[in-house]
């Protein structure tokens, strides 16, 4: 039967909207940027004004340079649903009722690498040499892993102990010389309640210790320009 080769396709579509803002002042070397998106369309203008937080996500960043080639930066990305999900569930970002794969390409998320339901704050200090041949970077990140899942998984138990949070400390060094470029990056991650897990130690106390993990990673890249 030739009809069995075809899968019915719904005419329903997914809609999204967003705006981007960037301000840069050359003299002070100050940059402010932001991106604001809706994962679902509004019913009308009244819906936009009354429930403006529904299905929203945003990024906000500030970067400030100095005369000594230092750059200070902070960025905040928030994909977690707002409290309005209790009445009007928007679903997690990068997913949709009609377009199940969401904003993806070959199974990979297009956009923030932290994934649906997560939040991230990043603090960085960079230092460049006068000729831009060397770069030194120190950074710190606070990552909330998929709070949307956490609220759904543990809502019935009201278990507020299981937030999965990562703290990343990293440093990077980059040097260019002759036809070579050397890059070394070191990252230390302290993960609290990894995958929302707790250790059952048979203690009568409600506050059980979480599954806390440590990870240290070193990446070295050497690139040759000359072929």
Question: What is each stretch, according to the model?
Answer:
Residues 1-227:
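Exposed, low-structure sequence patches enriched in small/polar residues
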């Amino acid at each position: 039967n030739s009809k069995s080769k075809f899968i019915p396709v719904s005419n329903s579509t997914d809609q999204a909207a967003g705006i981007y803002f960037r301000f840069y002042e050359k003299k002070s070397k100050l940059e402010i940027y932001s991106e604001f998106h809706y994962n679902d369309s509004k019913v009308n203008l009244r819906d936009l004004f009354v429930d403006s937080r529904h299905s929203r996500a945003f990024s906000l960043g500030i970067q400030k340079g100095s005369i000594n080639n230092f750059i200070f930066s902070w960025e905040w990305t928030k994909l977690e649903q707002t409290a309005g999900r209790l009445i009007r569930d928007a679903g997690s970002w990068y997913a949709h009722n009609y377009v199940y794969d969401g904003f993806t390409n070959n199974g990979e998320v297009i956009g923030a690498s932290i994934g649906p339901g997560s939040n991230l704050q990043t603090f960085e200090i960079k230092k460049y040499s006068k000729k831009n041949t060397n770069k030194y970077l120190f950074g710190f990140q606070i990552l909330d892993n998929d709070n949307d899942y956490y609220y759904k998984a543990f809502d019935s138990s009201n278990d507020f102990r299981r937030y999965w949070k990562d703290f990343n400390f990293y440093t990077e060094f980059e040097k260019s010389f002759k036809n070579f470029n050397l890059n070394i990056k070191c990252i230390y991650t302290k993960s609290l309640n990894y995958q929302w897990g707790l250790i059952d130690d048979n203690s009568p106390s409600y506050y059980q210790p979480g599954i806390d993990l440590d990870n240290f990673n070193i990446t070295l890249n050497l690139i040759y320009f000359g072929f």
